[in-house]
């Protein structure tokens, strides 16, 4: 959604029938999500959506799409905590908020059990080795004399108290648990648009912090492989690379191999069931963006157009939801959209049209690919 416009949405795409409901939450619950949905995750039988400006955690029944509870993230004086991101561990949810706190929520009762203080304006959270790692951005202090923060707070889960702060670099944001007891964080510099980004590794056994020369604004990790993306505000161009975390070497400078162009990458997630890479396109930040799915070879498999404003997070499940809603035709993606995509984009040899099969065969012409793709989709 757009900041202060109260127009966040949740889209649902079903791999079974290849249909999308663009505003799924509203269709089921007859109300919107709120203002600036910032993060989302599936844990157990529930979906958790962090709605930043509304200062809520929306808890949704995965099977039906119905809202179970809207948890108000408010301070004792009634002010908004402005939640940002969520992580889970042993039936507890941990939510970091811009007011410098982390809340512990019981995933059964959906009640806030405790609050602990960390650094300034936390903007990311993950779990590793029975500890929480929270990136303290200090982003709201950018224009003040105080400046941005440059630390990651380490919170012992058992005591729910901060045990240490690690200096990682100015304005840390995305933070993810990696292999071999590591945590990785992207630092964004004093001024995000200046491009002073860095990719930082934390060894959780020793708390050693290692800087790299990788320019990273956002990233996702799949085992030992990281997908790193960067956006240059001066040239308004983006780049996405594959990086081996173990060898600390670039696997492929350009992850996308088939010529697909993403103007404004806004989010990146890995499907744990297929290892496909999903990247969202925000376009100009004010019009509906898209979701693109790539295989590990960097080939576009499909694209969902106009899924919502500033799409930022994708969550996956190997189970189908069973909601009774039947959204109108305007809000559904017809399966033929995948075949029609061939008219707009000439695929490279081996281009995948959907998640299971390739429409390309040796010697196929452009028209042959379209015909074969349509035939296979109609058989589904």
Q: Which sequence ranges carry the predicted segments?
A:
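Predominantly soluble domains enriched in secretory-pathway, periplasmic, or organellar proteins
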Residues: 1-331, 338, 342-345
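Intrinsically disordered, low-complexity segments enriched in small/polar and acidic residues
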Residues: 326, 337-339, 343-344, 354-359, ...
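A detector of low-complexity, intrinsically disordered, Ser/Thr/Gly/Pro/Ala-rich segments
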Residues: 95, 105, 353-355, 372
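Accessible peptide chain termini
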Residues: 1, 379-380
């Amino acid at each position: 959604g757009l900041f202060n416009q109260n127009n966040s949405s949740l889209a649902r795409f079903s791999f079974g029938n290849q249909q999308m409901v663009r505003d799924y939450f509203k269709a089921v619950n007859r109300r919107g999500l709120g203002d600036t949905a910032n993060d989302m995750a599936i844990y157990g039988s529930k979906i958790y959506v962090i709605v930043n400006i509304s200062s809520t955690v929306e808890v949704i029944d995965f099977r039906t799409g119905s809202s179970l509870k809207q948890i108000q993230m408010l301070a004792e004086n009634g002010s908004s905590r402005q939640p940002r991101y969520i992580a889970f561990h042993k039936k507890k949810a941990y939510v970091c908020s811009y007011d410098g706190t982390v809340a512990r929520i019981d995933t059964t009762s959906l009640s806030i059990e405790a609050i602990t203080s960390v650094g300034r304006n936390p903007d990311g959270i993950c779990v590793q080795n029975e500890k929480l790692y929270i990136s303290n951005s200090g982003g709201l202090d950018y224009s003040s004399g105080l400046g941005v923060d440059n630390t990651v707070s380490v919170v012992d889960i058992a005591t729910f108290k901060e045990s240490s702060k690690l200096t990682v670099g100015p304005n840390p944001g995305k933070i993810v648990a990696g292999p071999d007891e590591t945590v990785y964080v992207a630092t964004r510099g004093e001024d995000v648009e200046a491009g002073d980004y860095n990719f930082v590794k934390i060894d959780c056994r020793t708390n050693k912090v290692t800087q790299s020369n990788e320019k990273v604004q956002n990233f996702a990790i799949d085992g030992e492989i990281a997908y790193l993306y960067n956006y240059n505000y001066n040239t308004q161009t983006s780049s996405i690379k594959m990086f081996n975390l173990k060898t600390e070497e670039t696997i492929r400078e350009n992850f996308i191999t088939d010529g697909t162009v993403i103007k404004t990458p806004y989010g990146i997630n890995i499907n744990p069931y297929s290892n496909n890479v999903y990247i969202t396109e925000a376009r100009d930040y004010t019009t509906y963006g898209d979701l693109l799915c790539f295989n590990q070879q960097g080939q576009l498999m499909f694209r969902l157009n106009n899924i919502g404003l500033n799409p930022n997070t994708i969550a996956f499940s190997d189970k189908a939801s069973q909601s009774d809603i039947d959204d109108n035709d305007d809000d559904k993606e017809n399966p033929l959209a995948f075949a029609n995509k061939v008219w707009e984009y000439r695929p490279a040899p081996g281009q995948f049209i959907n998640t299971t099969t390739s429409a390309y065969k040796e010697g196929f012409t452009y028209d042959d690919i379209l015909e074969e793709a349509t035939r296979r989709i109609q058989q589904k």
